[in-house]
C-alpha cells in the first residue's frame, strides 16, 4: 500500500514538473535571426505595447517593458508552451534616439524581413488611440512586398471609444488586411489572437 501511494505521488510530481516546463520562456536577444524554426513576428512603432503583449500571452512578465519608448533594440526571441517561436522586434519611428542607433534598428528590421526568413506570420501592432501613421503604411507595404502573411493588431482599445474603433476597422478593410482589436493590458480579445497563433 505504501509503495502504491509512493508510485502515484511520483507520477503526480512528474506531471507537475512537466507542466512547469511547458511555459513561455525568453530564449535570447540577437541583432539578426538566430533561429531557423518557423516563427511569429511582432512589430510596430515604439511604445505600442509589443512587449506588454508578449507578457499577456505568456501570463507572466518575461519581456522587459517601459513607459519610455525604444526599450527593445534587438530581436528578442521567446518560445511558448507549444514550442512555437515568437520574435519581438525593435520599435520603429522613435525620434529621441541617435541617428546611428536609428540606422542600426532599421538594418536589424530590414535584415529580419528578408524573403528567405522562416516567418509564419507578421503581427503589426498599432496604438489604437493613434491609428495608422505614415511609417506604419511604409512598413505594411514592405512586409507585403516581401511576401509575408500580415495581421494588424490594434492595441490599447480599452482607451478608445466606439467611433475610433470603427474608423480603425474601416481603414483595415480598405487595406484588405485582417485587423483584431485588442488590449494587452486587459487581455481583451487575446483568445482570438491565440487562435491565429495555432
Curated annotation (Swiss-Prot):
Binding site for Mg(2+): 51, 72
InterPro entries per the UniProt record, alphabetical: G_ENGB_dom (IPR030393), GTP-bd (IPR006073), GTP-bd_ribosome_bio_YsxC (IPR019987), P-loop_NTPase (IPR027417), Small_GTP-bd (IPR005225)
Protein name: Probable GTP-binding protein EngB
Names of required cofactors: Mg(2+)
Pfam families found in the cross-reference section: MMR_HSR1
CDD domains: YihA_EngB
Molecular-function GO terms, alphabetical: GTP binding; metal ion binding
Purpose: Necessary for normal cell division and for the maintenance of normal septation.
Keywords, ordered alphabetically: Cell cycle, Cell division, GTP-binding, Magnesium, Metal-binding, Nucleotide-binding, Septation
Family membership noted in the UniProt record: Belongs to the TRAFAC class TrmE-Era-EngA-EngB-Septin-like GTPase superfamily. EngB GTPase family.
Gene name of the encoded protein: engB
GO biological process: division septum assembly
Keyword ATP-binding assigned: no
Limits of the EngB-type G domain: 36-198
Amino acid at each position: 500500500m505504501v509503495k502504491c501511494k509512493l508510485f502515484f505521488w511520483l507520477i503526480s510530481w512528474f506531471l507537475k514538473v512537466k507542466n512547469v516546463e511547458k511555459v513561455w520562456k525568453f530564449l535570447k536577444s540577437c541583432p539578426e535571426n538566430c533561429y531557423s524554426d518557423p516563427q511569429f513576428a511582432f512589430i510596430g512603432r515604439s511604445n505600442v505595447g509589443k512587449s506588454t503583449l508578449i507578457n499577456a500571452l505568456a501570463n507572466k512578465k518575461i519581456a522587459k517593458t517601459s513607459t519610455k519608448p525604444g526599450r527593445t533594440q534587438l530581436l528578442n526571441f521567446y518560445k511558448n508552451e507549444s514550442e512555437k517561436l515568437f520574435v519581438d522586434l525593435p520599435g520603429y519611428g522613435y525620434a529621441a534616439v541617435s541617428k546611428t542607433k536609428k540606422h542600426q534598428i532599421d538594418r536589424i528590421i530590414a535584415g529580419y524581413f528578408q524573403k528567405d526568413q522562416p516567418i509564419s506570420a507578421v503581427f503589426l501592432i498599432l496604438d489604437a488611440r493613434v491609428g495608422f501613421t505614415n511609417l506604419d503604411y511604409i512598413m505594411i507595404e514592405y512586409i507585403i512586398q516581401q511576401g509575408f502573411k500580415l495581421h494588424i493588431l490594434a492595441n490599447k482599445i480599452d482607451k478608445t471609444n466606439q467611433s475610433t474603433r470603427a474608423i480603425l476597422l474601416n481603414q483595415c478593410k480598405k487595406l484588405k488586411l485582417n485587423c483584431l482589436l485588442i488590449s494587452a493590458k486587459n487581455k481583451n480579445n487575446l483568445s482570438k489572437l491565440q487562435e491565429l497563433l495555432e
